[in-house]
C-alpha cells in the first residue's frame, strides 16, 4: 500500500499594508544611501557618526563636571584628544594650578583639556579653534556643561601672531596640542615652535606651557623654547611625549 502524500502547506498571505510599508521603508533606505554617497567621505564621518561610540570615549575626569560626557566626531580625522590615562596624568602633574586660574587651550578641538580645567575651578578658559567642523562640537559641549560664563571660544589660527593678542590678558596654564601632521613636517614644526615661544608674551612669571608631540626613534631631542625653562619630559608609550615648560622670569 503506497503512503498517502501530504498536501502542500498553504503559503501565509502577507498583509497588503505590511508589504507596502516594507517596500516604502526599503525605498527610503535606498534613497538615503544614495544621498549619503554623494557627500564627501570626510564630511560623512562627521554627519553620520555613531553617538554611542564617540560619547563613550570622552569624559570629564574630575572636578565639578566629573563623569560628564563630551560629544565628539568619530575617528581621528578631525580631532586626536588625549586618552583618559594621559589626560589624568597631565592634570595630576599640574594639581593645584587650576583653582581661580586663567587657562588658554590652543588647538582646543572639542574642549577636552580646557573643559577639564574649568571643571577643576579655572576662573576663565579661552579655547582657540579654527576648524569649522569641530567648532560646533566644542560649543555644544560648553552649553551642555553650562559653563559658558567661564569658557569662551576664540575662532582663529593658534599659530598666528595676532591670535594670542586677541585672547587678552595673562594666562597661568597654556595647553598646546597641535595636530600630529604639523609636528612631523619640518616647516610646519618650525611654525609650531615659534608660536610656542610667543606664548611667553601672554604668561606671567609663574605657570606652565604644556606641549604634546609625537615621537619615534628618529625624533630630535625635545626642543627648548626662548623665554622658558625646561622642558620637563614625560613619555607616554613609544609614540608620545608631553613637555612641560615654565616661564623664565
PLM-predicted stretches and their roles:
Residues 2-249:
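Class I S-adenosyl-L-methionine-dependent methyltransferase catalytic core
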Amino acid at each position: 500500500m503506497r503512503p498517502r502524500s501530504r498536501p502542500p502547506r498553504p503559503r501565509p498571505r502577507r498583509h497588503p499594508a505590511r508589504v507596502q510599508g516594507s517596500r516604502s521603508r526599503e525605498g527610503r533606505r535606498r534613497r538615503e544611501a544614495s544621498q549619503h554617497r554623494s557627500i564627501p567621505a570626510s564630511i560623512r564621518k562627521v554627519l553620520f557618526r555613531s553617538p554611542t561610540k564617540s560619547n563613550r570615549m570622552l569624559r570629564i575626569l574630575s572636578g565639578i563636571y566629573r563623569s560628564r560626557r563630551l560629544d565628539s566626531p568619530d575617528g581621528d580625522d578631525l580631532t586626536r584628544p588625549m586618552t583618559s590615562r594621559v589626560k589624568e596624568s597631565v592634570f595630576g602633574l599640574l594639581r593645584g594650578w587650576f583653582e581661580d586660574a586663567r587657562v588658554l587651550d590652543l588647538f582646543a578641538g572639542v574642549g577636552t583639556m580646557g573643559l577639564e580645567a574649568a571643571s577643576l575651578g579655572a576662573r576663565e578658559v579661552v579655547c582657540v579653534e579654527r576648524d569649522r567642523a569641530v567648532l560646533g562640537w566644542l560649543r555644544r559641549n560648553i552649553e551642555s556643561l553650562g559653563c559658558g560664563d567661564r569658557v569662551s571660544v576664540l575662532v582663529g589660527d593658534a599659530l598666528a601672531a595676532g591670535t594670542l593678542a586677541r585672547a587678552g590678558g595673562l594666562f597661568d596654564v597654556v595647553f598646546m596640542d597641535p595636530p600630529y601632521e604639523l609636528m612631523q613636517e619640518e616647516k610646519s614644526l618650525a611654525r609650531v615652535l615659534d608660536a610656542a615661544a610667543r606664548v611667553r608674551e601672554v604668561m606671567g612669571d609663574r605657570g606652565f606651557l604644556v606641549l604634546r608631540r609625537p615621537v619615534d626613534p628618529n625624533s630630535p631631542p625635545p626642543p627648548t623654547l626662548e623665554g622658558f625653562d625646561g622642558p620637563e619630559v614625560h613619555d607616554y608609550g613609544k609614540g608620545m611625549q608631553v613637555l612641560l615648560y615654565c616661564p623664565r622670569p
